[in-house]
Structure formats: C-alpha cells, structure tokens
Amino acid sequence: MPKLKEKKLTIKDYEKLPEGSPYQLIKGALIMSPAPSYYHQEVEKKVFLILYENIEKRKNGKVFIAPFDVYLDDENVYQPDIVVILKNSKVKIIEKGIEGAPDIIIEIISPSTAYYDLIEKKEVYEKYGVKEYWIIDPKSKTFEIYLNSENGFEIISKAKIKGLVKSQILNLELNVEEIFE
C-alpha cells in the first residue's frame, strides 16, 4: 500500500476525510486500503458469523466488521477486518468507532496489507494491550492466534489448511478447514 503523504498526520487530519474513505492512519501516515478480494470477504464472513453466534447472540459482547475505526492514539487509527469487544471491556464505543484496545483483533491479510498487519499494526496492537491477535492468511490457508502476555504477543494456536485453532480468551475452537473451504 503506497503512502499518500510524508508529513506525520494525526487524528484531526484523519477525521477530515470523507466518511467511508478507504484509509487507515498508521504511525502518522495515511495508508490506502484497497478493496479486499472475494475470497478474503468469504473468509471474513465465516469468521464473523462464528463469532457473532458465540459472542453477540449469547450477550457476551460485540463483534464489528470493517470498516470500523479503532482509535489507539493520536497517530494510529486502524480498520481491522474484525473487532471483538467483550462485555466487561474497558474500551469506549463512540459514534465513529472505538477508543482503546479491543479484546480481540482479527486481520485477514492480503498482499497489499501483509506488511502492515504482520509488523506495523501488530507492534501497536501489542503495545496498547489487545489481548488476542488473530492473523488469517487466505492465500496460504494459515490461521494463527497470538496471546498478549508479559513477554508481548506469543503464538498460542496455529493451523494450516486443516485442524483447529483455539482462542484462550473466548475458550472457542475454530475449524480451519471450514473457514477456508
């Protein structure tokens, strides 16, 4: 994803963009997010529906799907693919998104977002206390779950093509084969 401006931007600059603009503010840089592929959307839909059934329907929290702004600090406003906020979370839901670190963030990577999802955003999610970070790669059919511990993000569950991954926060297993079919 090409950077549009070199000058460090802030939330004030970001909020001047028209609603629905396909950008994220990553470490003070305005980054364009191209529309995801059909398969990306299929994977996202399947994960969202599993989470919706297990969280929202049971009144254990909220699940949001992109585009949805997550305000972490003055230079970082992200639009993760899926955001989970559990019932007792300390994040603040506001009209334009949320302020603070959600309990779980899920990124479904694509060639244009991989660098940001795997490095830049991952570092910021870790710093601000996202409890679990799920990285799903539809191309390689891998699904990784990281838990934020005193040592930072540590991989706690991983599967490729087949198998189960388990969220410790949700005590939920997901069948990877069903997600990628």
Q: Model-predicted segments: where are they?
A:
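Gly/Pro/Ser/Thr-rich low-complexity, intrinsically disordered segments predominantly at protein N-termini
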Residues: M1-E181
